[in-house]
Amino acid sequence: MITKEMIDRINFLYHKSKSEGLTEEEKEEQRRLREAYVKEIKERVKRELDNLFADASHHHHHCHHHEH
């Protein structure tokens, strides 16, 4: 789950990378945090789209059924 702390940390590392640079450990942490963040966003979008298409499919069949 994406927490406020995760986002704060991503932002902190981003700004630090721009101002003074990151250590190798921080670069690795930043990479892992970003991967986790992107993975969760993708899963969230996929779930929403699956729900959307499931609803659309349900409504389509439902409407189609009434035509007969």
From Swiss-Prot:
Q: Which organism is it from?
A: Caldanaerobacter subterraneus subsp. tengcongensis (strain DSM 15242 / JCM 11007 / NBRC 100824 / MB4)
Q: Which positions form S-S bridges?
A: none
List locations, semicolon-separated: Cytoplasm
Give UniProt keywords alphabetically. Cytoplasm
The family note in this entry says: Belongs to the UPF0291 family.
Could you confirm whether the keyword Cytoplasm appears in this record?
A: yes
Q: What is this protein called?
A: UPF0291 protein TTE2340
User: Which top-level group of life is the source organism from?
Assistant: Bacteria
Q: Gene3D superfamilies attached here?
A: Helix hairpin bin
- Name the residues that span the membrane: none
Q: Which PANTHER family match?
A: UPF0291 PROTEIN CBO2609/CLC_2481, UPF0291 PROTEIN YNZC
What does the entry list under GO cellular component? cytoplasm
